[in-house]
A protein has these predicted regions:
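Short, Lys/Arg-enriched N-terminal segments with co-localized hydrophobic residues
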Residues: 3-18
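Short, surface-exposed connector motifs at secondary-structure boundaries
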Residues: 36, 58-64, 128-132
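Glycine-rich phosphate-binding loops that contact phosphosugars or nucleotide phosphates
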Residues: 54, 67-178
Length: 178
């Protein structure tokens, strides 16, 4: 188990020791959660550390952490922006037509549209040396793929968060995907 997962498990056990038998949650569920956390730590710990270092370097150098996503995944953008006690230099890149509240069918169509990422990110104030976090459940739609390429071409450090398990089983919809 990685260091972060071990600390989480220790804190959990400390809190659990204060509970009565009636209050204890189902062990099977919690065991699965900790197994998943340990697996994520083992498989992605180095990548998560590299992403954190990149964001720190951007902010420490006077830059920003840009955060972008489409569909349901846009919620990570909202979670990272303007939170009490959170990071201040976060630039949320939110486009109404790529979010569900204006219509799920329209949003789905728009996130598959070539050129849409450049249109949205072109107005976002991206600068070389900054870091951008792009979140996508599957990683297969055109806009997130084009957004990563657009940012990389402009000298940003690109951090992508997706489900590898899902994205490996689906064909990309992005014409330029490699």
């Amino acid at each position: 188990m990685g260091e972060r997962a071990a600390v989480s498990a220790a804190l959990f056990q400390e809190g659990r020791s204060r509970m009565t038998a009636k209050q204890l949650p189902d062990d099977t569920y919690l065991d699965k959660i900790y197994t998943m956390l340990a697996q994520i730590e083992q498989e992605e710990g180095a990548a998560m550390d590299a992403a954190a270092r990149a964001a720190y370097a951007s902010i420490d150098g006077g830059g920003l952490l840009h955060v972008f996503s489409t569909g349901h995944s846009h919620m990570i953008v909202e979670e990272m922006f303007y939170r009490s006690g959170g990071l201040v230099p976060v630039n949320p890149i939110l486009s109404d037509e790529l979010m569900l509240h204006t219509g799920a069918i329209t949003s789905t169509h728009m996130e598959r549209m070539p050129g849409k990422a450049a249109e949205v990110l072109g107005k976002a104030g991206l600068r070389a040396g900054d870091t951008i976090l792009i979140s996508s459940n599957t990683g297969i739609n055109t806009v997130p793929v084009e957004a990563a390429l657009y940012a990389k071409e402009r000298g940003l450090t690109v951090v992508c968060v997706t489900s590898k398990k899902i994205s490996r089983t689906l064909a990309s919809r992005a014409p330029e995907a490699k």
